[in-house]
Amino acid sequence: MGKFQKGFFVGATTAAHQVEGNNIYSDCWAQEQLKYSIFQEPSLDAVDHYNRYQEDIEYMADAGLNAYRFSIEWARIEPEQGKFVETEIEHYRNVIRCCREKGLEPFVTLHHFSSPLWVIQKGGWESEDVIQYFAEYVEYVMKKLGNEIKYVCTINEANMGLQISSIMERQKRQEKANASRRKEEGQQVQLGMDSEKMEENERLGAEENERVFYTATPQTFCSSRTEQGDFIVMKAHQKAVHIIKELYPETKTGLTLSLHDIQPQPGGEERAKAEWEKEFTHYLPYIEQDKFLGVQNYSRSRIGADGIVPVPEHAELTQMNYEYYPEALEHVIRAVSKQFHGDLYVTENGIATADDTRRIAFIEKATDGVASCIADDIPVKGYFYWSLLDNFEWHRGYTMTFGLIQVDRKNGMKRQVKPSLAYLGQLCPDK
């Protein structure tokens, strides 16, 4: 008997801006072109998944995966306010149908960090207007594609802006106290965020931002978020869920959250409790009616009396400079399940490494933890590895290799499947 039973989803995840290429109407694309850009390099063609999705889906199917989580790019669907592009809807319809033809269940994310440039020019994610903008986009997509989708994530990592805000606040406190400029553990998890560069470019690029975004401080989804902005994101989620329920009541809908394995050290118990409250617990009133929650975890965060404790000496680090700690996933699932009682999906979990044997070991240990949770009757229904492809890792560009498939961007985007894809596939109970 395998690790998981029939009906459990084993898949991989991508995000449109990171893999498709030429997302020219998005805020991220605009930021990449700035003189004082927060991005190490521009995304350009990314890994051309937009034109090669059939090939990439075929690789997943051949490996034995039974699900694929991907995002629909809002900036492609609605490049100008109120002007929806039918050909782009048809593109995503083709992606969905390709998944089904190859035996993969499509899990569709409606917003994965990038937004249309016009949304940011109109106030972005700190403006209440974005709730209605997002709702109109969601309604359009669901009316067109909803009959072909069973699982929808409204917003990816809805808590990311608040996490970035916390990072910025900690950094400022360190500077004020003449502290070391050493990167804090967990600071760059997933987004590849360089908070120092973000702050510097906000200062230097104000005039450029005024020209491009109509404001000196554009409020993208991945900007440092205020509590009011956090509330706006959650109201946008709730309105989207309402729309989807009205159109397709049987569709399973939820969002995803970025969650650290927060471990209190002696004297840090109250701080750790406050961190978990900010990162997870305060979202419960907004998601308690959702049919599932997407859990996204990459490592742990140890909290002492004075805040985050450095990574243990001699600990293995990933390319992202955080601790290799696959056990974190099980700990997070168990913590979440005590407070959220719906279905859980691991919608992202993985590492950036050039050593695929370490990736395989990571997947093995992490999925052992998932299986242990299921054995204790925690309703975990799927595991999605981040990411399918070595891709554009936001501020860090193409230097971080998370993928199950290598992409040679200098040689015609040639794909090379890594052994880790086959390893993940053999975990699928349907194989």
Language-model features: where?
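Non-catalytic scaffold segments within catalytic domains of secreted glycoside hydrolases
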Residues: 1-52, 57, 61-66, 77-431
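Active-site gating/metal-coordination segments in enzymes
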Residues: 69-74
